[in-house]
A protein has these predicted regions:
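C-terminal output helix
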Residues: 97-106
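Two-component/phosphorelay signaling modules centered on CheY-like receiver
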Residues: 2-35
């Protein structure tokens, strides 16, 4: 499985955890991530670990390229949850995120469930 991690800062702990689930490529720019998808094909999941407008910019870049790639946005600002829906993020998590939450959500995205529960509503973890 190929996972894209989009963040301006190094996320060693999260990267190590995601590496247990698949091959991880880290990008500090949404444009570079979309370029990699154009060149090598879409990722199995994209994880955006940026707060506020930066996270929104990453999501806009990803969704501008693909409406289908599973997208998880993690932010420390819960008030951006409505924007995550507008950006069509499959799941929005509020920091701090436990290792269990990250593993479960990414695993679900990789399995193609894309963050939806039985009723088809988006799941939000806080």
């Amino acid at each position: 499985m190929r996972i894209a991690l989009c963040s301006y800062s190094q996320k060693e702990k999260e990267t190590a955890l995601l590496m247990k689930l698949g091959k991880v490529d880290r990008f500090d720019n949404g444009v570079f991530c979309t370029y990699a998808m154009q060149r090598d094909g879409p990722y199995d999941a994209v994880v955006v670990m940026e707060d506020g407008a930066r996270g929104m910019n990453f999501c806009m870049s990803i969704r501008g390229y693909s409406k289908d790639v599973p997208l998880l946005w993690i932010s420390d600002q819960a008030e951006f949850e409505p924007q995550s829906r507008r950006m069509q993020a499959d799941t929005f998590l509020v920091k701090p995120v436990t290792e269990y939450q990250l593993r479960e959500v990414v695993s679900r995205l990789l399995q193609g469930k894309r963050g939806s529960n039985e009723s088809g509503e988006e799941e939000k973890y806080e």
